[in-house]
């Protein structure tokens, strides 16, 4: 903890930083390791990043191939009391699918290019963009809030109230997307890059 009594939370990517910010308000000190737009696949932690992880109370990462550096860092630090949350462990996972312009929208072939789904170890063939699903965001936010309440029990009511409010907002957004999907005129989405929204579109069939 910091001298002001706040717990320290470190996140790898912005979605989880934002979840913590929505759930914890000013009760925690949050550090984001990768700035928005950074490529997590090419990220290498700086010494200051490793120090931040060692000194934090909760460390939140995505897990999977994009965070393959995490286990090495965690094994190297002396503080073994850091609570580690790998978000891919908190939601149902979906296998990567080929969704480029040369395939039909409902293709279910595994991606086999050089950096996706190829020569991966077992357990690494899943699509890692789990945060794009609003329903996954609800699951992950609830788990993060529970961990905050466990580590910082004196502020449990505060975290629980914010969890209830935030999940209510997410649920409302989910209902709006459901309504849009139920009234859609087309079943096609066009992307000019690798398709990152498998979890999102799966929520709405």
Segments the model singles out, each with a brief description of its role:
Residues 1-205:
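Extracytoplasmic metal-acquisition and chelation regions
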């Amino acid at each position: 903890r910091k001298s002001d009594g706040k717990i320290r939370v470190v996140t790898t990517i912005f979605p989880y930083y934002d979840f913590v910010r929505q759930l914890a308000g000013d009760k925690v000190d949050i550090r984001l390791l990768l700035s928005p737009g950074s490529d997590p696949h090419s990220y290498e932690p700086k010494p200051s990043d490793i120090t931040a992880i060692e000194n934090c109370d909760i460390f939140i990462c995505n897990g999977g191939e994009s965070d393959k550096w995490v286990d090495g860092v965690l094994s190297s630090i002396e503080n073994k009391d850091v609570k580690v949350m790998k978000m891919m462990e908190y939601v149902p996972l979906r296998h990567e699918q080929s969704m480029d312009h040369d395939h039909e929208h409902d293709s279910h072939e595994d991606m086999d290019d050089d950096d996706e789904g190829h020569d991966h170890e077992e357990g690494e063939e899943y699509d890692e963009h789990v945060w794009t699903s609003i329903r996954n965001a609800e699951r992950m936010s609830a788990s993060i809030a529970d961990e905050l309440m466990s580590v910082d029990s004196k502020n449990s009511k505060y975290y629980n109230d914010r969890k209830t409010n935030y999940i209510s907002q997410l649920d409302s957004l989910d209902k709006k997307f459901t309504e849009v999907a139920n009234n859609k005129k087309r079943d096609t989405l066009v992307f000019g890059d690798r398709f990152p929204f498998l979890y999102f579109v799966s929520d709405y069939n």
